[in-house]
Amino acid sequence: MYNYFLFMTNFGADTPFILLAKITVKEDKVSEYLELADKTDKAVEAVAPGMLHHTFDQDPENPLVFVWSEAYKNDEAFIAHLANPAVGKYLQEHPKLADDFTVEVYGTVGDKCLEVMKGTGVPFKVFQSKLGYSRL
């Protein structure tokens, strides 16, 4: 059922993590944003084997708020994700279509991954793992 079962006592660059990116789209730009998100999602699915989960979810109370929920196999998978040209285009187009973009990472990531995150210019917060396990 699972590719591997990992009890995590040491968290770091080789362990899975979850990323939630919350976006508030401009009122008159929702359909354009959904088109951009759809193109990006398809491009990610085609070339990112380390991306274990990738959905674009709409807030049930505010139709302008969306959340990318993503699960990564490890830091290398995230760094490869950001190197995808479609993701670069998405990050360039985002400010034209949305007012807000914040990222929360759940899990421990290495220094290289943190530097790559900082390089996006997107505000982010990392919640470092202290205990637990992953079946991703």
Feature locations, PLM:
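Short, Lys/Arg-enriched N-terminal segments with co-localized hydrophobic residues
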Residues: 1-7
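Short, surface-exposed ligand-recognition loops at beta-strand->loop->(often short) alpha-helix junctions
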Residues: 25-34
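An amphipathic, aromatic/His-enriched active-site/gating alpha helix that lines ligand/cofactor pockets
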Residues: 12, 43-52, 71-128
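A short beta-turn/loop motif at secondary-structure boundaries
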Residues: 57-63, 95-98
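Long, compositionally biased terminal regions
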Residues: 119, 135-136
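Short amphipathic alpha-helical/adjacent loop interface patches that line ligand
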Residues: 37, 41
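Short beta-strand/turn micro-motifs at beta-sheet edges
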Residues: 7-12, 54-58
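Active-site-flanking beta-strand signature of metal-NTP-handling nucleotidyl enzymes
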Residues: 16-24
